[in-house]
Amino acid sequence: MSEHPQGQKHCSFCGKTQSEVGKLIAGEDAYICNECVDVCLDLVQTSQQVEAGDWASKALPKPHEIRAALDQYVIGQDLAKKTLSVAVYNHYKRLKVGQSGHVSKDVEIAKSNILLIGPTGSGKTLLAQTLARLLDVPFAMADATTLTEAGYVGEDVENIVQKLLQKADYDVEKAQKGIIYIDEIDKITRKSENPSITRDVSGEGVQQALLKMIEGTVASIPPQGGRKHPQQEFIQIDTSNILFICGGAFAGLEKIVQQRQEKGGIGFTADVKNKDETKKLAELFRQVEPTDLVKFGLIPEFIGRLPVIATLEELDEEALMQILTEPKNALTRQYQYLFNMENVDLVFEDSALRAVAKRALERNTGARGLRSILENVLLETMYDLPSRTDVGTVFINEAVINGEAEPVYKSERQPKEAVTHESVAKADLKVIDSKSA
């Protein structure tokens, strides 16, 4: 213990005795006085302010730069990318202005959370993940179908913020600038347009619970790995500056939009439309209005918290082909990297990739289905390769994708210049035309 020769207890940091300070706090082998505690607190707070200032001084990517970064990972969806780029830029510009202290007393910029509407596998989750990675902010994802009102079996809405705090390594300041993506938001719609006497704890009840969280409130989060109980101290997280992005497929919403448009008028000025005419899904989604979402089952207050609506298109065959070959994290590139680790080249014929795209379209799973198709096709090959030393190249053609043939094995590896294809030269992928196999 820290004691003077005379036996008086003293602070291990400044050396002052117990009689010279207001309070002396005992540790296992040392003491610290109240004055040194105050100094330490000031140092910690100053350090946090410097870190916050560092973030505020970082150059914020402009909308064009955000869009360019999204283009590297997400194919198509031009309107959604543009909408997201502007919304995210304005959101973090608002945060920087707030931290710099140059806040206008006359104008208060409200938070613009985002609603993504698009079919399954169109890139909603990937867009949100890419944004978080680009901006270097914590990112957490939640499934709305697992959420229930507090007190019922299921996940509490505050668990979403806890996930974000975990991603930020329990750095509160960092977490409060993060992005939360809530998927399957269309699955928590009201079960009926009419009020019900039975409590809807996983539909409208969850929407009500999310309202304050999305708008901005102080959430009480238990410490690391803990569960809530009355005696513990909670970590306070202000959600006012957390960007919430909600996404969903909203199957059936297009019919509501079309019905509204086909009502027309009365008399000679009526807009007569052929009801058999069906518009493209993307075109209908682009014309979504808040009243359509209310009819779908979202409550007006919830829609009001998501003022920015970005719609995504269904992916066609060409888009799926591009997804297989062009992005930085293209699936073909990922599998070729895995095969290269076994000192084997993986070569896809152009017709094979088109067959993969066609099968994904038939399954109606969008880009999400591409991986499962390739995984099934390459399963036996990936099982055998680590045990073989006589394979240098594996060729995949259309017949292999369709289950009509086995992959072709060759002992020698391919010269790099022989396996590049014009359509994917920029991506540096080993994709060859079916005629040159």
Swiss-Prot record:
ATP binds at P119, T120, G121, S122, G123, K124, T125, L126. InterPro entries: AAA+_ATPase, ATP-dep_Clp_protease_ClpX, ATPase_AAA_core, Clp_ATPase_C, Clp_protease_ATP-bd_su_ClpX, ClpX_bact, P-loop_NTPase, Znf_CppX_C4. Signal peptide: none annotated. Zn(2+) binds at C11, C14, C33, C36. Residues 1-52 form the ClpX-type ZB domain. GO terms for molecular function: ATP binding; ATP hydrolysis activity; ATP-dependent protein folding chaperone; protein dimerization activity; unfolded protein binding; zinc ion binding. Keywords: ATP-binding, Chaperone, Metal-binding, Nucleotide-binding, Zinc. GO terms for biological process: cell division; proteolysis involved in protein catabolic process. GO terms for cellular component: HslUV protease complex. Pfam families: AAA_2, ClpB_D2-small, zf-C4_ClpX. ATP-dependent specificity component of the Clp protease. It directs the protease to specific substrates. Can perform chaperone functions in the absence of ClpP. Component of the ClpX-ClpP complex. Forms a hexameric ring that, in the presence of ATP, binds to fourteen ClpP subunits assembled into a disk-like structure with a central cavity, resembling the structure of eukaryotic proteasomes. Belongs to the ClpX chaperone family. This is ATP-dependent Clp protease ATP-binding subunit ClpX. The gene is clpX.
